[in-house]
């Protein structure tokens, strides 16, 4: 396990030095903290007899869904450096398995072997040479491809105004949906006071209310006159010889 972790640490160290944002002491401090974190994490999830077991748990991943790897971030915090100063690409995946460390650098690039080990007797110089050769190859062959993939990623995230439908959707008021507007009814024209004079004197009774006035939302029914009873004014007696004013009829 120590060789595989050493390969991962060498890989990150070379990337950080290429970015040239941190001093040598800060890079060494980061490498030491990352080594301790990975050893503590992998010690109970390392299966030489079945290397693929626990592969997802040991994976170090940076992409648009996980922009910061938690183990690398913890190493930065423990070594008092900023994560952004590492200069990591936007798409990076490292598979740390027994006897082999693989990497995919960039979004559309193929995975490659960073280092493979047949035994545990290899020294750090040999591991460093393997990692350096692999990293030099990937940065020279895939650097332009990873940059274009990062640009494609930013373009995918950006929302283009032309892709959005510009046709306005109909807007309805809540009152229109719940309470439909009632039809307009024209009021009866007002009559002058002189029109209700009968028998030489002004009537004290209002004009008759039109019966069977249509109501909104209902079908018109057949006209049925409402029975009325004539109520004589106080002090006036009714007999058959008197003329009855129709405006003096009042609903019963």
UniProtKB/Swiss-Prot annotation:
SUPFAM superfamilies on file: BTG domain-like
Transmembrane segments: none
InterPro entries assigned: Anti_prolifrtn, BTG, BTG-like_sf
Region (Disordered): 138-162
One example of a Gene Ontology biological process annotation: negative regulation of mitotic cell cycle
Classification via Pfam families: BTG (PF07742)
Inducers of expression: By 12-O-tetradecanoylphorbol-13-acetate (TPA). Induced at higher levels by TPA and cycloheximide together. Also induced by redox changes after stimulation by hydrogen peroxide or menadione.
UniProt superkingdom: Eukaryota
GO cellular component, one term: cytoplasm
SMART domains associated with the record: btg1
PROSITE patterns noted in UniProt: BTG_1 (PS00960), BTG_2 (PS01203)
Tissue: Highly expressed in the brain.
Gene3D superfamilies named among the record's database cross-references: Anti-proliferative protein, N-terminal domain
PANTHER family, per the entry: B-CELL TRANSLOCATION GENE, PROTEIN BTG3
Family: Belongs to the BTG family.
Role summary: Overexpression impairs serum-induced cell cycle progression from the G0/G1 to S phase.
Protein name: Protein BTG3
Primary gene name: Btg3
